[in-house]
From Swiss-Prot:
Organism annotation: Paenibacillus sp. (strain J14)
Misc note: This homolog of an antiviral immune evasion nuclease may be due to cryptic prophages, or it may play a role in regulating the endogenous antiviral defense system based on cyclic nucleotides.
Ligand binding (Zn(2+) 2): H61, H63, H145
Protein name as catalogued: Anti-Pycsar protein Apyc1
Reported cofactor(s): Zn(2+)
Molecular-function annotations in GO: hydrolase activity; metal ion binding
Length: 245
């Protein structure tokens, strides 16, 4: 059965027209939430999805537009079904996620004092594919974003690249397509300005046509519509639409 992708949001961190760049990945009867940003709970409500319909969450890196909704998710599950959400995460993100992001809101003396007390934490290792469900395999690929802050893009079922926030890595993209059989690329984009911590549209336009033709763009700013027709062989992902992969 083919995978399906539904972006809860396609916006950059400061976008207001679009929700945070988070996604639902459907693999058979398994639903994975890729990142859970500040707007994720509202986006789920908007498309009529309950947190109870999410089988697991995977976090790519620690910024508010990717983890800011985890506190609400944890509390809604705690006071709903009572089931801990399954959380897939790189080992080196566990401590900063708890200590720097979630501890203040979720900790409770004598009851909750670690990430494991509120989530069913399942560690992922960089470059080691993990079978998350019968029809879903995910490999973490570390990609540059903020110096000193780990960030992981995803290689899904040995054929789909889903970028985290990242600076331009043309060699990686070409290697995935030409050597590893990648056929779809969901890539973040910064439409204007210098790409200090993101990949710019101009950088992506420098890629060979064969690579561009496999790219759908996400994590864009509110002026996205004015760039229609100016993205070469690439197109924009639309939030809430379901894409068969």
């Amino acid at each position: 059965m083919a995978l399906r992708l539904q972006m809860l949001g396609t916006g950059g961190a400061f976008a207001k027209k679009y929700f945070n760049n988070n996604a639902l990945l459907y693999a058979g009867d398994f639903t994975l939430l890729i990142d859970c940003g500040i707007t994720a709970p509202l986006a789920l409500h908007t498309i009529g999805k309950s947190v109870e319909e999410i089988d697991a969450v995977l976090i790519t890196h620690i910024h508010g537009d990717h983890v800011g909704g985890l506190e609400e998710l944890a509390f809604r599950r705690k006071f709903g079904s009572g089931r801990k959400p399954i959380l897939y995460i790189a080992e080196n993100l566990v401590e900063p996620l708890w200590e720097n992001t979630l501890k203040g809101g979720l900790s409770q003396d004598g009851v909750i004092h670690s990430l494991n007390d509120v989530f069913d934490v399942r560690l992922l290792k960089e470059s080691e594919p993990a079978q998350l469900a019968p029809e879903l395999k995910v490999e973490l690929i570390r990609t540059p974003h903020i110096p000193g802050k780990p960030s992981y893009s995803l290689y899904i079922n040995d054929e789909i690249f889903y970028s985290a926030d990242m600076t331009f890595e043309p060699e990686l993209l070409m290697r995935l397509v030409r050597e590893r059989g990648c056929r779809r690329i969901f890539h973040e984009v910064q439409l204007t300005g210098k790409g200090e911590v993101h990949t710019t549209l101009q950088e992506l336009l420098s890629l060979p046509t064969e690579i561009q033709s496999q790219i759908l763009l996400k994590h864009y700013s509110d002026d996205m519509e004015s760039f229609r027709g100016a993205t070469g062989n690439m197109d924009f992902l639309r939030q809430h639409e379901v894409y068969t992969l």
